[in-house]
Amino acid sequence: MALKIRLARAGSKKRPYYHVVVADVRAPRDGRFIETVGSWNPVLPKDAERVKLDAERIQHWIAQGAQPTDRVLRFLDQAGIAKRPSRNNPTKGEPGKKAQERLALAKQAEEEAAAKAAEAASE
């Protein structure tokens, strides 16, 4: 049985509240779960009351093979329970092809202007 440590939504409309639960991957998001190991109230301001986790039980379930979802792994990383590897995609932040062409043309024009200025200064 594959297990996940994930969020199960509770609360009312426009007032979300999430339970951090250990559940079978085949179970519905808000359906059957094995154990509640924490909670997250995104409505509260950023303080200690916003995320509550039972570190001992979470470590037990991780040792049993439960995989935390990305959002839960962020909480665990902040609490110092588990380490979330940083993702690195250096090409994602680069400008597109046309923007790179424009930058190259602008740089070339700037170099030509600097060369003309240096030539005029040497005369």
UniProtKB/Swiss-Prot annotation:
Residues 79-123 are annotated as: Disordered. InterPro entries: Ribosomal_bS16, Ribosomal_bS16_dom_sf. GO terms for biological process: translation. Signal peptide: none annotated. GO terms for molecular function: structural constituent of ribosome. Pfam families: Ribosomal_S16. Belongs to the bacterial ribosomal protein bS16 family. This is Small ribosomal subunit protein bS16. It comes from Brucella melitensis biotype 2 (strain ATCC 23457). The gene is rpsP.
